[in-house]
Amino acid sequence: MEDYQAAEETAFVVDEVSNIVKEAIESAIGGNAYQHSKVNQWTTNVVEQTLSQLTKLGKPFKYIVTCVIMQKNGAGLHTASSCFWDSSTDGSCTVRWENKTMYCIVSAFGLSI
């Protein structure tokens, strides 16, 4: 049981990271409609708040967070990522959030130190 708790304390827990990302998106964008002039501010706020909250977890990781905000206008968007890492210690999480006017896609990567 102690080994499980120790592993949990140093693991990249996808559900935990996903919740942090969702909270950051809601806080930064919330119920706003897409405004091109605000996108830079929103993306910066999302990644900085996400990084801040991940760091507060106190886990032995280096983090990488990306954020894409795209207006809903019928255009397609395809993204992919590939990582060469130790899947037993490192992890990633991608959250897709949307409202009536935009999509927000955030990826968070945790690399064990």
Curated annotation (Swiss-Prot):
GO terms for biological process: cell division; establishment of mitotic spindle orientation; intracellular transport of viral protein in host cell; microtubule-based movement; microtubule-dependent intracellular transport of viral material towards nucleus; negative regulation of neurogenesis; nervous system development; regulation of G protein-coupled receptor signaling pathway. Coiled coil: none annotated. GO terms for molecular function: dynein intermediate chain binding; identical protein binding. Residues 41-113 are annotated as: Interaction with GNB1. Keywords: Acetylation, Cell cycle, Cell division, Cytoplasm, Cytoplasmic inwards viral transport, Cytoskeleton, Dynein, Golgi apparatus, Host-virus interaction, Microtubular inwards viral transport, Microtubule, Mitosis, Motor protein, Neurogenesis, Phosphoprotein, Transport, Virus entry into host cell. The modification N-acetylmethionine is found at residue 1. Expressed in heart, placenta, skeletal muscle kidney, pancreas, spleen, prostate, testis, ovary, ileum and colon. Expressed in lung endothelial and smooth muscle cells (at protein level). The keyword Hydrolase does not apply. It comes from the Eukaryota. CDD domains: DLC-like_DYNLT1. Pfam families: Tctex-1 (PF03645). GO terms for cellular component: cytoplasm; cytoplasmic dynein complex; cytoplasmic microtubule; dynein complex; extracellular region; ficolin-1-rich granule lumen; Golgi apparatus; host cell. Phosphorylated by BMPR2; the phosphorylation is abolished by BMPR2 mutations in exon 12 which lead to truncated forms of BMPR2 and which are linked to primary pulmonary hypertension (PPH1) [MIM:178600]. The phosphorylation status is proposed to regulate the association with the cytoplasmic dynein complex and may have role in cytoplasmic dynein cargo release. InterPro entries: Tctex-1-like, Tctex-1-like_sf. The keyword Cell division applies. It is found in: Golgi apparatus; Cytoplasm; Cytoplasm, Cytoskeleton, Spindle. PANTHER family: DYNEIN LIGHT CHAIN TCTEX-TYPE 1 (PTHR21255:SF19), T-COMPLEX-ASSOCIATED-TESTIS-EXPRESSED 1/ DYNEIN LIGHT CHAIN (PTHR21255). Homodimer. The cytoplasmic dynein 1 complex consists of two catalytic heavy chains (HCs) and a number of non-catalytic subunits presented by intermediate chains (ICs), light intermediate chains (LICs) and light chains (LCs); the composition seems to vary in respect to the IC, LIC and LC composition. The heavy chain homodimer serves as a scaffold for the probable homodimeric assembly of the respective non-catalytic subunits. The ICs and LICs bind directly to the HC dimer and the LCs assemble on the IC dimer. DYNLT1 and DYNLT3 compete for association with dynein IC (DYNC1I1 or DYNC1I2). (Microbial infection) Interacts with human papillomavirus 16 L2 protein; this interaction is essential for virus intracellular transport during entry. Acts as one of several non-catalytic accessory components of the cytoplasmic dynein 1 complex that are thought to be involved in linking dynein to cargos and to adapter proteins that regulate dynein function. Cytoplasmic dynein 1 acts as a motor for the intracellular retrograde motility of vesicles and organelles along microtubules. Binds to transport cargos and is involved in apical cargo transport such as rhodopsin-bearing vesicles in polarized epithelia. May also be a accessory component of axonemal dynein. Plays a role in neuronal morphogenesis; the function is independent of cytoplasmic dynein and seems to be coupled to regulation of the actin cytoskeleton by enhancing Rac1 activity. The function in neurogenesis may be regulated by association with a G-protein beta-gamma dimer. May function as a receptor-independent activator of heterotrimeric G-protein signaling; the activation appears to be independent of a nucleotide exchange. Plays a role in regulating neurogenesis; inhibits the genesis of neurons from precursor cells during cortical development presumably by antagonizing ARHGEF2. Belongs to the dynein light chain Tctex-type family. This is Dynein light chain Tctex-type 1.
